[in-house]
Amino acid sequence: ALSDLESGIGGEVTSSGMAAVTLIANTLRLNSKVILPHDCYGGTIRLFTSLKEKGVLDVYFTDQSDLIALEKTFEEINPDLVWIETPSNPLLQVVDIEQIAQKAKLHHSLVVVDNTFLSPVLQNPLLLGADIVMHSSTKYINGHSDIVGGAVITNNEEILTDLKFWANNLGITGAPFDSYLTLRGLRTLSIRMEKHEKNAAAIVELLSNSDKIKTVYYPGLLNH
């Protein structure tokens, strides 16, 4: 069901969001070059930094909103994989998936998008040129705060085969009952995301008008 919502051909359900990140990382070859956003989720930063320190991967953190600087990094290292997180966690920085994916294809780089914060209701990375989309289904996808889970989805048969191989090897697939509860959550995802947007807008308006608040980070603001 989640694969259909993301316009993928299949994927793997994992035991957590970080298990999804770990699964993708394990599909890479030794010394693969990876570009990540400088402000992505802390767990993602810690994992890839540790893999860099162990000499497993070559990892480069960049400001992906600066397309000129990003293009320079592409030219310098010719990455094997580009990791995108938009909006980013926690500062909600927004980048253009389609533009970055186009640049990545020129360098034959795979593109992964962490779509946790928007869900397939509001953003479909595979339709914008990404090869893989991942989620921490613990959050919006499930929406009931009663499971921990993740998911990795692709529109490429070769990548899908690799994902299934490594998910089985690592033993990080999701539990059946957690998957059942997540499927329940998917049934109300569209309605919940609509309400989340309305609630967030109301909170942002309140905070923006308070003289006690210095800065509000929210993609819906014109000055974001």
Where are the regions a protein language model picked out?
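Aromatic- and Gly/Pro-rich amphipathic surface segment
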Residues: 1-6
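Conserved PLP-enzyme active-site core in the AAT-like
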Residues: 11-212, 217, 222-223
